[in-house]
């Protein structure tokens, strides 16, 4: 389907970009065990009506990373790239459930970590306690996803 075409395009561009980045890092003598990579996941663009399934995103992202990122890199911290909070968490969880990878897979989300908390806060001091609870919940869900232990049944 169309979503798969866009994901393939994302895969190809991501792979080419990552290979170029690591070639340049090697040329500059960068110590790879001392870096973290902050890439996108292989997803269809946010404008695409057909997003495809969670496992396809996880499989294509891991395949892209496996083909592009040296094993010496200790960790990969993903951008959410316009995904919803739950989608970003589900995709990270699916990748970590696939088994061992040469790098730790974690998150460096902005919107996908903060969006619900900011909406709850709405600039009102009286909302701070509930805002903290919402933010803590989202962080906890992503923490579980880092070890492949997230479940949508834990969502509030």
Regions found by a protein language model. Give the residues of each.
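Active-site capping/gating regions of soluble enzymes
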Residues: 7-156
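Short, small-residue-biased leader/transition segments that mark boundaries at the very start
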Residues: 2-6
């Amino acid at each position: 389907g169309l979503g798969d075409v866009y994901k393939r395009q994302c895969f190809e561009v991501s792979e080419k970009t990552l290979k170029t980045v690591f070639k340049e890092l090697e040329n500059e003598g960068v110590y790879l065990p001392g870096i973290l990579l902050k890439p996108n996941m292989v997803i269809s663009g946010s404008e695409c009506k057909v997003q495809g399934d969670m496992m396809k995103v996880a499989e294509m992202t891991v395949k892209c990373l496996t083909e592009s990122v040296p094993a010496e890199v200790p960790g990969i911290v993903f951008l959410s790239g316009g995904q919803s909070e739950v989608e970003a968490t589900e995709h990270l969880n699916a990748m970590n459930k696939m088994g061992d990878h040469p790098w730790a897979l974690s998150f460096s989300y902005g919107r996908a970590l903060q969006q619900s908390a900011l909406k709850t806060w709405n600039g009102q001091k009286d909302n701070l306690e509930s805002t903290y609870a919402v933010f803590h919940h989202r962080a906890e869900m992503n923490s579980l996803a880092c070890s492949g232990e997230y479940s949508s049944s834990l969502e509030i």
